[in-house]
Amino acid sequence: GKLADPDQLGNGEDAQAIIRETPAVAWMAYGIHGDELSSTDAALWVAYQLAAGQDEASRRIRENVVVCVDPLQNPDGRERALTLTRMFIGQVANPDMQSAHHTGTWPWGRGNHYFFDLNRDFFILSQPETRARVSALREWNPQLAVDSHEMEPWETYLFSPSREPLNPYLSPSYHKWIRIFAEDQARAFDRHGWSYYTREWLDNWYPGYTDWIAYAGAIMILYEQAGVAGTVVRRHDGVVWFHPFFPSL
């Protein structure tokens, strides 16, 4: 916490010493909308890879970064979404997005126990999950934060930075590093031939989103994966997508 509070720093040399001797902190958050099921599923793979991966990248992360994985930010919403899916799925999953097991009934799984959208609460702090999460984030003061979501199945993959106009209340350093991360991620997607887009509908003006942490100095990356509503969907182009774990729902 000393580096995050300038009042505790004596001079620039103190800050540089902390930077050299202290590992970076990354905060990986998943499942703030309970009906975006693949987000939490991905968190388990990320945690396993970081803990057990023997590749060079995983080893370097373990040696140099403290990674905090928050795998399920909205457990009540996820349980409600899974209950609706089990209720309406039938013997054979229907890929039509208008079928009942995709649309469900109110209250859907997006909100928490009180049906509140937790991804709108980060300056209001009206919900217990948000208050606990903000307390933990202020304790760890991550340099990198990731928020993972799902979007409609006919989309591809979205990641930061946001569309213009850019938020002038975020530091020039933030805008610089978010571009560096985006360019690196774009190259990785290009190597695999994966479709993606960026600088589109995403904005980072509203301080109630998870990316409020950018105001505290973190580089905040949003990931939006095309979803399959927990089971199987037929896209507009006729492609059928499956959730890899839906038979176990």
Question: Which role does the model predict for each range below?
Answer:
Residues 131-155, 176-205:
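Active-site-adjacent substrate-binding region
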Residues 29-36, 119-123, 171-175:
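Second-shell loop/turn segments in exported
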Residues 127-129, 193, 227:
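Metal-centered catalytic cores of metalloenzymes
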Residues 1-6, 13-23, 42-46, 59-125, ...:
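Surface-exposed loop and adjacent secondary-structure segments within mature catalytic domains
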